């Protein structure tokens, strides 16, 4: 059994330890905000936070999560259900288009802003490498 936390709640996973985190989240825990895009860790649609750092869930095996903390887009809002400031900015700036890639983009942005609180356009372009499935971004 592999024990870890997802969005602050304990998880005791007794399935295939080599299952990718993406499928454990979506199929076992019914957390469908994390999206499947490429399956090879390139597009970023599946970005979650593991111990506070952005990681691609489609290439992360559950076996690597023992004792770790996973945050998904569903867990990004505060306990009071107040949107995270990045989520709020996404809405205020009217960013949403089709929305498929946005959970991953939001998660990547939150991680990026922790180390780059006042980024330049060049910083953003160099560090946010998520791909947009519909081509809007």
Task: Give each language-model segment a name.
Residues 1-137:
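Signature of N-terminal electron-transfer/Fe-S-associated modules in redox systems
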């Amino acid at each position: 059994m592999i024990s870890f936390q997802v969005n602050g709640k304990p998880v005791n996973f007794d399935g295939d330890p080599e299952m990718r985190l993406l499928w454990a989240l979506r199929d076992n825990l019914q957390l469908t905000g994390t999206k499947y895009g490429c399956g090879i860790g390139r597009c970023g649609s599946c970005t979650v936070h593991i111990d506070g750092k952005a990681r691609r869930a489609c290439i992360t095996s559950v076996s690597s999560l023992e004792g770790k903390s996973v945050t998904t887009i569903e867990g990004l809002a505060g306990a009071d259900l107040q949107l995270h400031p990045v989520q709020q900015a996404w809405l205020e700036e009217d960013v949403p288009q089709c929305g498929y890639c946005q959970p991953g983009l939001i998660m990547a942005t939150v991680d990026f802003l922790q180390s780059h609180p006042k980024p330049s356009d060049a910083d953003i372009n160099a560090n946010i490498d998520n791909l947009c499935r519909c081509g809007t971004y």
